[in-house]
Amino acid sequence: MKKFFVFLSSSLLILTSCVQSRELENLGLTTAVGYDLAQDDLISSTIVLENFNPQIENSSRTVTAQSHTSKGMRQKLNLETSKNIVSGQLRVAIYNEELSSKGIYNLVDTLSRDPSIGNMIYLCVTDNTAKEILNKKDPTNANSNIGTFLYNLIEQNYKGDFIPSPTLHNFLTRLWEVGRDPQLPVLSITDDFVGITSMGLFENDKLVYLLPMDKIFYLNVLSEDMKSGNTEIGLPKGDLEKHFVKPAESMERTQEGNIIFITLSHIQANKDIKLKESEELTFMISLKLKVRIVELSKSLELGDPKTIEELTKVLNKKFKENLENTLYEIKETKSDPVGFGEVYRVMKDSKLTQEKWRELYPSSKFEVKVDTTIVQTGVID
């Protein structure tokens, strides 16, 4: 009798696994979705489908349809595939720059209302079309799904403190906070490869500016809790020149210009933003940085405490200059990704509205103080 029950149980397990396998083979698992602006106020939607078929190495494909609404597109997309499209594996949503500039709230809200989609999926913008991005292949693995590649691309840059958080949850939280705006990474195709090239700044749900790559660090250090950031910074030789290592003539590397470049890693940032007590709308930004020196374009006597002291002063001055330039550049766009309005609301006006902050923000000023500590130089004592 026991043998019969063992045989029956085994048979049921095999049958169940076969049924589950057949069910999966009938599904089109959406790993990425992209939205572009089409003619006649239509929206073009492209999805990447992963077809569950262990016998086919590269079983992903893209499907495109146009409609006025996200759900309308879903219906049309289902008409173009033999698989039942499901969103439970969605990892990335991409919005074309032109579409984003007109507002993407309705499209983002639809994702948040779908119970099968988690709120930790990544959102991003592209200055190409979303369709172009999603029709690219993973350059590291021809059989990989492009949706998975894009997810990993964004994930490692976010976790590496290169870009601010681009999750669906974070976008909606910032969208509804008074005195703070969303920001999303921008994907571009360069030399046939997809990569992050800038940061898209929003005013409410509308894209207003693409912040250049060299400014993203300064935005990130103020808008996120940086634990292990990286950056390359150019410093004027000036007072550092007397601390240069004097190599043998045959080893001397000629370097043009008056700039020395330093790569810093494992950057930890501790920031404090306060509203200055005066009639002027001035924010006091205090930033403490701990950095490690990884590489220099010109060798310095880093074993000498006087060199470290001088280098720290120069770093403080340059960080302050770059931060202030970035903040005023961002302010010109009318976007507030750092959240100065939130600081104002907490410290000055608890009844602040988004409309009122839009009136106040353009007149705001910034005073930055930076205190850098070099915790490691790479020098072996």
Predicted features, each with a name:
Residues 3-6, 13-381:
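Membrane-proximal alpha-helical signals and transmembrane carboxylates
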